[in-house]
Amino acid sequence: MTARQGPNNGQQADTAPAPAPEALQAGAGQASSAPGLTRMQGDWSSYFRQPGVAPRPTGMEPRRIDVYASLLRNNIGSFIHQCFPLCEALIGTSNLEALIDRFFAEGRWHTSPFFHEIPKAFVDFLQAEDAPADESLPPWLAELAHYEWLELAVETAPDVPLRVGPQGLALCPALQLGGYAYPVHTIGAEDAEVVPATTFVAVYRDRQHQVRFNVLTPAAAQLLDALQDNGCDWQAACEQLASHWGLAADELAGQVAPLQQQWLADELLLRPGTAQPAAAG
């Protein structure tokens, strides 16, 4: 199976802290436990989330408050627009803006102090049990958003030491495995109706630090998951799956040998210390 280049989100890995309203201080010399400060923080937070509903906080020039609220909402919205271009193209900018407004109003965006983690919070918002119920939105939207977000997650994942198994093989350290009820890798503007189809996709960085996408069969996805669980111990993974599938471990190892070669060629699987990946003998 051939890895393919996924959609280019153009998302920047900005690690600047997002200014959560609750963290605002009235002055450097004031104690954070003061009741007045706590009340003020709550007023600011409510207004920033719903400026058209909550009353404007007192103690600061209204124009400055409104400018800050607008900047905060626009910054959060810009990160979501950048990370989910395909979702936006398919549901329309107005629908995406409506989702961002609710996401912002509910305050789910400041679960992390880093702007680059806002898209993951937005995916969690779409996947939540109380996610927006709108018949005009496609049922696959949350899964497509997760698929688009995986590119950002892999692109910005830190470099970590390879976890080399006993056979001298290692999985790409930035590897993410996604499982979906819809064929998220084929959804496009030309699709009048998307038919459900169980889909597994491995998303990873190759040796040139390019994000690649590899669509997997259910069996291949189970093998990859077993390799992740067993520290890329190919024999242990085969033994685990063989007992589950009612096969001998050696028999299964022979059946998946071509897959090992393909993953090495795709650089999803690595042989550390070699200039080019080579299949195990």
Please report, for each region that a protein language model flagged, where it lies by residue.
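N-terminal, charged low-complexity regulatory/assembly segments
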Residues: 1-155
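Hydrophobic packing positions characteristic
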Residues: 102-222
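Short helix-to-turn junction characteristic of helix-turn-helix DNA-binding domains
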Residues: 226-232
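Short acidic, hydrophobic short linear motifs in intrinsically disordered regions
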Residues: 232-242
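Long, positively charged, glycine-interspersed low-complexity recognition regions
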Residues: 246-247
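Short amphipathic alpha-helical interaction segments
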Residues: 250-262
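A short, conserved structural fragment
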Residues: 264-275
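Short, cationic-aromatic polyanion-contact patches
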Residues: 275-281
